[in-house]
Amino acid sequence: MSSPGGLHSAHLSSSASRSEAVANAANAAAAAAAAASGSPHWQQQIVKAEISRQSNSPHHHARAAALAARSATSSAIAIQDPSKGIVTPQVAANGLFVAKKDSSAANGGGADDGKGSGADTAPATTNGAAPISSTSAKDKQTWSTIDMGGLALKNIANEVYRYSFLTSLFINHNALTTLSSDIVKLRHLTVLDASGNKLSSVPPELGMLTSLRELFLFDNNLATLPPELGTLHQLEMLGVEGNPLQDNLRSLLQREGTTAVIAYLRDSCPVPLPPPEREWIMIDPDLPDLDADKHANDATQESFNVLSYNILFDRYATAQMYGYTPSWALAWDYRKEFILQEVMSYSADICCLQEVGVEQYEDYFLHHLSQQDYEGVFYPKSRARTMRDDERRRVDGCAIFYKSNKYQLIEKQLVEFNQIALQRPDFKKSEDMYNRVMTKDNIAVIALLENKLSGSRIVVANVHTHWDPAFRDVKLVQVAMLMDEVEKAGARFAKLPPKPSVAEGYPPPPKYTHANQIPTIICGDFNSVPETGVYDFLANGAVPGDHEDFMDHVYGNYTAQGLQHSYKLESSYVPIGELPFTNYTPGYEGAIDYIFYTKNTLSVTGVLGEIDKQYLSKVVGFPNAHFPSDHICIMSEFNVKRSDRGSSSTTAREVHHPTSSSNASSMPRR
């Protein structure tokens, strides 16, 4: 049989086999070792190795599949994985049809916020993007397996590595002495069989193939394994019997199996060089020309910067979720110092953190950041309401830190989405609200800040929406409720009289009559890519009630009339394009964290750039030794646009805020 691109030989030649005496000696030694250790793990090695040795004929796997299919009534021919006897879904390069394997469960969505799976199974793609369907058969890949086994090949053609969609590659029982590092391009491989060759080493790039479930390297000349293979966190079977493997690896495999070997390699892997510092990208402010000329050298021109960072809550950072991360790099004692150092190094005026534990906030971050002139506002998720104090300290939430030498906190507010939903009359008849929104305990935190020198004001909202891509309707509802609360808070803030006095050299403090006249920041982990309804709603100010992200669920006026807000918002990264990702794991990478700002009151003047691409080419995901969370921080700098200033008032104002349905609390002026 021939395959596309001339990958297979047109004729079937017999492969050169190993010496019978060598094979028998290896089998006898392995059997003796297994018997001596009584290890089920090594017994499994022997069984799999024997199956591999019986698969040394040309195109063995493809021929076995064809033979098995002759008696089947279906026209599909399933190539079988000989190691399991289980149908491997695909179509081989030699033209054999096979069933398609679904690996979505392995790759999943962005790891975040509880890391569980939702009860609702509505189709959705990672982090809330609407599912994409293809109606064209020619757009669908019809094969994903290549069987090049038993052909006495000395080299693999480079064209093979162009087929990045491959999920199974059989290059067993050839005469290969090396594997090309280009194999890193086959990121979707779940099965790789390179048994029965002459390999004395395997490339460290194999560690980038994090979807691998089975890696067969039986009967080669391997004395050791590269520690980079420690990132193969989904590997179920590492076949190395028949190799002169060093004693420590062999004994570990005998005693504890594949998982233990991978963990050992992962934790002993040398730490690579850190990446270059992320570039700070300057952006020309969009101030009108006359205004820009007037204030070009004005020392009273106000600017501030905002940092947003999901720091990965300690209780979510488990070895099960982040099996590719060294245990020492996943430990909170290591990560917390790295996070604190990173936040302090950027020295942002306003820092918005998500997934901050109560204990971490009270005992660590507040303590250290207060020494850098920060004060903080923090609320845990709604579940903390009903917990004992010791349990409550193990709940995460959202925190806003601000420079206390620059800003005064006027009001802080907790936004509990499930509690707000209870108070809306139009939601009371919605089963979807009770079944989908009320069961999620996500929150947002709002802080109303006033500049101590100029009297100008800022509304800051820090949010962490639900993570599950199957609940993108819930994310949209949560953000809609957040914008409702931001507008209410802004309206209260606008009613307050201006600051009684300002610093010398500053113009009179601004007077605000409407909420949208106050500079406003909406930032956080939205768990939504730019193509979703959440981003569309924030950036455009409205989405229709029949938007696809509602998924035909009913949410009172939200779906009856559509969503809208009165702010002119834009993501701060729009001038350069959203970052390639803010969440980076083997199963998902994409932009889901944003800093939105009001364009009529603020100009973005700079943003923190992306991570070095060369560094990323050798990294399977975060967290790792250099990045302590599965998210990266984002940061932007803003200029406050000048507005008409009223005359300063000498009358001291009385600070009073009406009670909000979402737990607003006011702070007296100092």
Swiss-Prot record:
User: In which ranges do the LRR repeats occur?
Assistant: 165-186, 188-209, 211-232, 234-253
Cofactor names: Mg(2+)
Gene Ontology cellular component annotations, sorted alphabetically? CCR4-NOT core complex; Cdc73/Paf1 complex; P-body
Which reaction is this enzyme known to catalyze? Answer: Exonucleolytic cleavage of poly(A) to 5'-AMP
Kindly list the positions annotated as binding Mg(2+): 355
Where does the UniProt entry say this protein principally localizes? cytoplasm
Task: Give the top-level enzyme category.
Answer: hydrolase
**Which UniProt keyword terms apply here?**
Activator, Cytoplasm, Exonuclease, Hydrolase, Leucine-rich repeat, Magnesium, Metal-binding, Nuclease, Nucleus, Repeat, Repressor, RNA-binding, Transcription, Transcription regulation
Question: Polar residues bias located where?
Answer: 123-136, 646-670
The cross-references to Pfam families, in alphabetical order and at most eight, read: Exo_endo_phos, LRR_8
Query: Which cysteines does the record link by disulfide bonds?
Result: none
Family the entry assigns: Belongs to the CCR4/nocturin family.
Descriptive protein name: CCR4-Not complex 3'-5'-exoribonuclease subunit Ccr4
Organismal lineage: Eukaryota, Fungi, Dikarya, Basidiomycota, Ustilaginomycotina
What is this protein's gene name?
A: CCR4
